């Protein structure tokens, strides 16, 4: 059984994205602190924040602080997505497509795959999604990992990244084993049916 992983070029791209996300997160933490003039010392954080709120905040403080708070919360989720892509491995097996990454191990039965669709046709490096008939994330016992994986991909989809080595070979094998036929790459299943009727 062959396992498909992100190529070295894909890993370099993921590393650049990861560094960028960490820089954004550090900037958001610094800007949030300086905008509200609070301390990040665990003992003083809540008391200094409460003092600033009780003293009253101006619009010039509230708007940037809220934007930075959104970045502080959202950026770690983006970092998880990038790390999960970095460690992603796809293995076609007899009973289905096995996906592993960062402690996750999911097996998607071949009969549970309903389609493969291209996410962005116009991209230089397109990403395809494997669409499932139902939610298989219940195989993940850890609720935190289940949430993180679900927010990264959705519960009924699994991306096949542009940086995946031998991606077209994997796509062909998935189509063959799942009985999806010779659906042209990049065409929605409905559109592929329309082409065959033309």
Located regions from the model:
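Acidic, Ser/Thr-rich low-complexity segments on the non-lumenal side of membrane proteins
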Residues: 100-138
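Hydrophobic beta-strand residues in large extracellular and virion-surface proteins
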Residues: 4-6, 97, 113-116, 130, ...
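N-terminal membrane-targeting/pre-transmembrane regions
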Residues: 1-63, 185-198
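Hydrophobic alpha-helical transmembrane segments of multipass integral membrane proteins
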Residues: 21-29, 68-79
């Amino acid at each position: 059984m062959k396992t498909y992983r992100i190529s070295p070029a894909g890993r370099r791209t993921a590393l650049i994205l990861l560094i960028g996300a960490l820089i954004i997160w550090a900037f958001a933490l610094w800007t949030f602190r300086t905008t509200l003039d609070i301390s990040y010392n665990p003992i003083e954080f809540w008391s200094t924040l409460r003092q600033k709120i009780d003293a009253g905040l101006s619009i010039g403080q509230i708007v940037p602080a809220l934007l930075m708070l959104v970045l502080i919360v959202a950026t770690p989720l983006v970092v998880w997505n990038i790390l999960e892509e970095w460690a992603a491995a796809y293995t076609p097996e007899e009973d289905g497509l096995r996906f592993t990454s960062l402690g996750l191990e999911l097996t998607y039965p071949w009969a549970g795959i309903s389609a493969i669709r291209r996410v962005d046709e116009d991209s230089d490096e397109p990403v395809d999604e494997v669409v499932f008939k139902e939610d298989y994330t219940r195989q993940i016992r850890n609720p935190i990992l289940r949430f993180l994986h679900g927010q990264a991909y959705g519960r009924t989809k699994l991306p096949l990244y542009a940086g995946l080595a031998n991606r077209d070979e994997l796509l062909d094998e998935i189509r063959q084993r799942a009985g999806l036929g010779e659906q042209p790459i990049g065409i929605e299943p409905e559109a592929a049916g329309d082409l065959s009727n033309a």
